[in-house]
């Protein structure tokens, strides 16, 4: 909570070439917190996404809420990401919710990069926070300093990686330092969840953001696309409703390609139904643009896909999703009087 996720997201979008300037939460002009409630309260309520580049490589980020009240948005976003940047404040340190998010990421086999934020504040303790990440989360942290470069991670860091990987150690002893081999093996260790890079910085003034961009480019670049003839398959990670009542289904494409007007298999009670994609778009904050097609790894939004729910798999091997791991402590029930017709109640809801 209040670790600086949205501020860091704005800096990534700014330094990644998407924004002309980074917005501020306290000014209410951020790209990703565009909802009226978010801007008035100064907190992230809805998970929203945008594109940026790191060292010439394309990325898409999803800025998620930090408050436990909106953990559902965060958990659903985990289904869509190839890696996660876990932001920890150097002032508050590792919190209980940090541990919850960490467990969810581990359960879903999502690689993690730590950004230790607010290191510029007088009460910050970067070293203590790094030690707490190692002790409380059990993460094998690889500290990446301000001189880290995606093109050449450096021999000192390569030696740290070699100490964790027999293949890289053998190659290092035989041939010496090889920048490409060190970067590739480092990326493999990060993808496997065996190593978690960590960057210390201060998102508000941009400190450490360029280092983070280089870390993402070196260790977290998108996987290679599958063969073009693979059957289309995607996971639903979010559903939004337009003002006209239409449903927009947000998808992470897992294989194959999706184009507008194509029929897609969707899970329904008792079997599978086919729905036509009436529109395909890519979102960036509150704005969107039409897509001609969406390939493997793409985050897109489709209209017309029936009543699918977050977690469902559509396309080949269409099936309902697993229930969320996080359960709310409180629940609410709407009790209508006998004078209210069921259809009218449904319209009101």
Describe the role of every protein-language-model region.
Residues 1-349:
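Structural and coupling elements of P-loop NTPases
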């Amino acid at each position: 909570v209040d670790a600086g996720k949205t501020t860091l997201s704005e800096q990534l979008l700014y330094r990644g070439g998407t924004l002309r300037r980074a917005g501020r939460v306290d000014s209410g002009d951020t790209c990703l917190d565009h909802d009226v409630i978010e801007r008035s309260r100064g907190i992230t309520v809805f998970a929203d996404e945008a594109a940026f580049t790191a060292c010439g490589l394309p990325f898409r980020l999803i800025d998620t809420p930090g408050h436990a009240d909106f953990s559902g948005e965060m958990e659903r976003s985990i289904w869509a990401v190839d890696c996660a940047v876990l932001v920890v404040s150097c002032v508050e340190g590792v919190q209980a919710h940090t541990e919850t998010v960490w467990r969810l990421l581990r359960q879903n086999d999502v690689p993690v990069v730590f950004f230790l934020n607010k290191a510029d504040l007088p009460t910050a303790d970067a070293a203590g926070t790094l030690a707490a990440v190692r002790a409380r989360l059990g993460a094998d942290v690889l500290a990446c300093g301000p001189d880290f470069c995606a093109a050449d991670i450096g021999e000192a860091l390569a030696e740290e990686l070699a100490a964790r990987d027999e293949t890289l150690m053998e190659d290092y002893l035989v041939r010496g330092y090889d920048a490409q081999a060190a970067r590739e093996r480092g990326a493999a260790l990060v993808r496997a969840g065996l190593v978690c890079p960590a960057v210390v910085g201060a998102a508000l003034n941009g400190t450490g953001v360029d280092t983070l961009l280089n870390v993402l480019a070196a260790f977290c670049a998108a996987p290679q696309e599958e063969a073009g003839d693979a059957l289309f398959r995607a996971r639903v990670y979010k559903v939004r409703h337009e003002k006209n009542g239409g449903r927009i289904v947000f998808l992470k494409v897992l294989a194959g390609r999706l184009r507008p007007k194509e029929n897609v298999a969707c899970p329904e009670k008792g079997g599978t139904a086919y729905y036509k994609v009436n529109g395909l778009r890519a979102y960036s904050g509150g704005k969107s643009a039409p897509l001609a097609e969406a390939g493997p790894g793409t985050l897109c939004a489709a209209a017309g896909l029936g009543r699918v729910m977050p977690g469902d798999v559509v396309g080949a091997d269409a099936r309902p999703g697993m229930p969320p791991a996080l359960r709310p402590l409180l629940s609410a029930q709407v009790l209508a009087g006998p004078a209210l017709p069921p259809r009218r109640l449904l319209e009101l809801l």
